[in-house]
Amino acid sequence: LLALCLSAPAMAQYEYGEGLDVPYVPSPNEVVETMLKLAEVKSSDVVIDLGCGDGRIVVMAAQKFGARGIGYDLNPERIKEANENAAQAKVQDKVKFIEKNLFEADIKEGSVITLYLLPGVNEKLKPRLLAELKPGTRVVSHSFEMGDDWKPTKTVEVNGRRVHLWVIPRRAAGN
């Protein structure tokens, strides 16, 4: 609740699409770095950021960890800004940004999925994450959890902000 109150001034900047209302509130760089470290990102990873905004998570994953990355966002201005940030960081060969609804994003290639979405959006996305991602894929969320039935593997705090990590479990035999 406190996190929602703190982000209230930014609530005016909404991204819209098929019932998806997510405010554009960028994660601070220290939170981004914590997210990537918590997920133990390495050069062999593909980091997919759903609701990438200005691309800072994907850009940092490429720049600091050597990972490849894909960012999805509905807003063409955010995609343009993300591409500019990738070019400025000289990582445009490792990242790409796609203008698309996050529920239509191709997430199967991801070994790390990053989120800074509202709780209801996380919960709506959860069945897809569990169904489409390979066991061992790391999912990291800034601030918001995935509901009561999927507890984080680990939660850390950075400057009063929570970062949650989940690992996609092995599927039961026959699934």
Task: Name each model-derived stretch.
Residues 44-53:
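Conserved class I S-adenosyl-L-methionine
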Residues 1-9:
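Bacterial N-terminal signal peptides
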Residues 108-124:
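A short SAM/SAH-binding and catalytic strip from SAM-dependent methyltransferases
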Residues 11-45, 76-109:
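S-adenosyl-L-methionine
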Residues 55-59:
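Glycine-rich SAM-binding Motif I of class I
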